[in-house]
UniProtKB/Swiss-Prot annotation:
Official protein name in the record: TAR DNA-binding protein 43
Sequence ranges of Basic and acidic residues compositional bias: 261-274
Gene Ontology annotations for the cellular component aspect, listed alphabetically: cytoplasmic stress granule; interchromatin granule; mitochondrion; nuclear speck; nucleus; perichromatin fibrils
Record domain RRM: where: 104-200, 191-262
Sorted UniProt keywords: Biological rhythms, Cytoplasm, DNA-binding, Isopeptide bond, Methylation, Mitochondrion, mRNA processing, mRNA splicing, Nucleus, Phosphoprotein, Repeat, Repressor, RNA-binding, Transcription, Transcription regulation, Ubl conjugation
Coiled-coil region list: none
Broad class of the protein's primary localization: nucleus
Organism: Mus musculus
Omega-N-methylarginine sites (modified residues): 293
Start-end of Low complexity biased regions: 342-358, 368-392
Region of interest called Disordered, as start-end residue ranges on this chain: 261-301, 341-414
């Protein structure tokens, strides 16, 4: 007498009841009729909770010792078939995932200022269906920024558009994936290479014919007027990257191949060379307050009264606001300095000083830079400009605006 046993493809699925033969066995053909590709049955032992196989002899499945009972039997498949099925499912899942990620926004660089979004859509519609176009504009003026974005429906259209340059409203434009689409851990790969050391007799056709031996070439561009270089774009970025750094011979001339993408260098902090007592670049002959050797910051009589617009007082930095304040204080101090200088001219001996002809130089007094003096008299309060190695002598104009190599003093001396 036949009975029905419960069979399923997975323990969590709903089972199917299939009939047994009169002798209590089950034909494998009966199982495969419901589960194509099945090669046997297994069940979970109620005692050990382990999976146990059903005995199969010449296409006939024999019941366990206790009979078929109310157990649920799971279908077995050949391992190769199961592996193929799993790979097929995984491949399908990957294809679906890739299909979602394939199309993305492309950036269009080098757009003419007059190009509108409608112009951009009309142009790219010749390649395929366009989902979105956008021309980036300045928020204040409303004028184009010279670039935009486009997205296509089909990935094949996107690849085709990216593989060539585009003449839009009379100007060559590039269309590519934005850098933000690249993974942070993945280097930016370009299909375009820079060909340096070209000669004027090299034509675009000759370059294309030469580089075709490495891979499909989609574009060759030689700037005009001629500037001894060219750009070659391949269909495959791997071909382009493999050529970077190579020196090739074209028409007997050695050319150098490198990446055509702009290099993203970090911002550099430039050192300002015009400092007090420093290098050229300011008002006067040497660009500093004082001469270039003494490191002082006064009115230097060695260099004819140089007055520079430096940025550093030794280790003390000056920003533009502080510099403006210093200039304002300088202008307001000229009157007082002129009056004091007049008093010094009346009391001090005369000499052949190059900065102020009536003043005598003495090596131990300061107004200026280095070891030179401005006044030969000890009368008058020590006020004024500059400091040098002997700025503390107590006569003339000492203290000062600047810094000294020896005394390390700085500020406005009074």
């Amino acid at each position: 007498m036949s009975e029905y046993i419960r069979v399923t493809e997975d323990e969590n699925d709903e089972p199917i009841e299939i009939p047994s033969e009169d002798d209590g066995t089950v034909l494998l053909s009966t199982v495969t009729a419901q589960f194509p590709g099945a090669c046997g049955l297994r069940y979970r032992n109620p005692v050990s909770q382990c999976m146990r196989g059903v005995r199969l002899v010449e296409g006939i499945l024999h019941a366990p010792d206790a009979g078929w009972g109310n157990l649920v039997y799971v279908v077995n498949y050949p391992k190769d078939n199961k592996r193929k099925m799993d790979e097929t499912d995984a491949s399908s899942a990957v294809k679906v995932k890739r299909a979602v990620q394939k199309t993305s926004d492309l950036i269009v660089l080098g757009l003419p200022w007059k190009t509108t979004e409608q112009d951009l859509k009309d142009y790219f519609s010749t390649f395929g269906e366009v989902l979105m176009v956008q021309v980036k504009k300045d928020l204040k003026t409303g004028h184009s920024k010279g670039f935009g974005f486009v997205r296509f429906t089909e990935y094949e259209t996107q690849v085709k558009v990216m593989s060539q340059r585009h003449m839009i409203d009379g100007r060559w434009c590039d269309c590519k994936l934005p850098n933000s689409k690249q993974s942070p851990d993945e280097p930016l790969r370009s299909r375009k290479v820079f060909v340096g050391r070209c000669t004027e007799d090299m034509t675009a056709e000759e370059l294309q014919q030469f580089f075709c031996q490495y891979g499909e070439v989609v574009d060759v561009f030689i700037p005009k007027p001629f500037r001894a270089f060219a750009f070659v774009t391949f269909a495959d970025d791997k071909v382009a990257q493999s050529l970077c750094g190579e020196d090739l011979i074209i028409k007997g001339i050695s050319v150098h191949i490198s990446n055509a993408e702009p290099k993203h260098n970090s911002n550099r902090q430039l050192e300002r060379s015009g400092r007090f007592g420093g290098n050229p670049g300011g008002f006067g002959n040497q660009g500093g307050f004082g001469n270039s050797r003494g490191g002082g910051a006064g009115l230097g009589n060695n260099q004819g009264g140089n007055m520079g617009g430096g940025m550093n007082f030794g280790a003390f930095s000056i920003n533009p606001a502080m510099m403006a304040a210093a200039q304002a204080a300088l202008q307001s101090s000229w009157g007082m300095m002129g009056m004091l200088a007049s008093q010094q001219n009346q009391s001090g001996p005369s000499g052949n000083n190059q900065s102020q002809g009536s003043m005598q130089r003495e090596p131990n007094q300061a107004f200026g830079s280095g070891n030179n003096s401005y006044s030969g008299s000890n009368s008058g309060a020590p006020l004024g400009w500059g400091s040098a190695s002997n700025a503390g002598s107590g006569s003339g104009f000492n203290g000062g605006f600047g810094s000294s190599m020896d005394s390390k003093s700085s500020g406005w001396g009074m």
